[in-house]
Design a protein with these regions (language model features):
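Conserved N-terminal catalytic core of the sugar/cofactor nucleotidyltransferase
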Residues: 1-8, 30, 34-101, 105, ...
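N-terminal nucleotide-binding beta1-loop-alpha1 segment
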Residues: 1-22, 200
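Histidine-centered beta-alpha loop that forms part of the nucleotide-sugar donor binding/catalytic region
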Residues: 11, 54, 129-130
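Hydrophobic packing residues within well-ordered alpha-helices of enzyme cores
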Residues: 17, 60-64, 222
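Conserved beta-strand segments of alpha/beta enzyme cores
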Residues: 27, 48, 69-71, 148, ...
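Catalytic-core segments of class I nucleotidyltransferases/pyrophosphorylases
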Residues: 98, 105, 111-118, 132-133, ...
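A short, conserved acidic/glycine-rich loop-to-beta-strand motif
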Residues: 120-130
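Short acidic-glycine loop/turn motifs at beta-strand connectors
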Residues: 142-148
Length: 227
């Protein structure tokens, strides 16, 4: 089996960016004159791409409508990250997929991560990092000695010294989502805690920094990284 498809979540509202950006969909905010999502499309360029659109989705659709490598999956009502994925999976035949947030970027060896996923016959692989200074808006992951995920806590107020941070990139077997219907649910809060109980879910730690565009300050940091 091989991985051929990547889902990118592009429905974020960017509520903390309202003073900075009132008109553009969050993933289209320009970083050094380039829409942020272009960095993700380059990272996952070897795969067929599905963009999950929601808030201001028509902007993303207009931008990529003529791109033959991109499938557009629109949510007509708010679905959350989990619902957006389930909605997109209805149009995807592949059994293995990559999923990425559309407003954050983490540089890592993607081929190595997919090799581990396939060789170990993992059901759900979360890319994680120990390269972070504060919790910010990221989920914390606790693993055992074999890197199997023991617990996941989205946006905790504190974390243990040994916890890892979720990078917002996942490799998964489609079947882990089989019991979920299209609804307003969260991948991080609703789905991941449940699949940890029933599937082989592992962390792949990459030691890389995560760059996101959640605040004006983080946008400046991302601009310096992508120069």
């Amino acid at each position: 089996m091989q991985i051929n498809h990547c889902i990118i979540l592009c429905g974020g509202r960017g509520t903390r960016l309202r003073e900075f950006n009132l008109t553009d969909q969050k993933c289209l905010i320009h970083i050094n004159s380039v829409p942020f999502i272009e960095y993700l499309l380059k990272q996952f360029s070897q795969y067929k791409i599905t963009l999950c659109t929601g808030h201001l989705g028509e902007q993303v659709e207009d931008y990529y409508r003529d791109n033959k490598n991109i499938i557009l999956s629109r949510e007509n009502k708010p679905l959350g990250t989990g619902g957006a994925i389930i909605n997109a999976l209805g149009k995807i035949k592949d059994d293995l997929i990559i999923i990425s947030n559309g407003d954050s970027f983490c540089e890592f060896d993607l081929n190595h991560a997919t090799k581990i996923f396939l060789e170990k016959d993992i059901d759900f692989l979360m890319i994680t990092t120990d390269n972070f200074k504060d919790l910010g808006d990221y989920g914390m992951v606790e693993i055992n000695e074999k890197s199997r995920i023991k617990s996941f806590n989205e946006k905790p107020s504190n974390a243990g010294l040994d916890n890892l941070m979720n990078c917002g990139v996942y490799i998964a077997k489609k079947r882990v989502f089989a019991n979920y219907e299209v609804a307003n649910i969260s991948l991080e809060n609703d789905i991941i805690p449940e699949i940890l109980k029933n599937y082989k879910c592992y962390s792949h730690n990459v030691h890389s920094k995560v760059y996101d565009i959640g605040t004006p300050e983080r946008i400046k940091i991302a601009e310096n990284f992508f120069k």
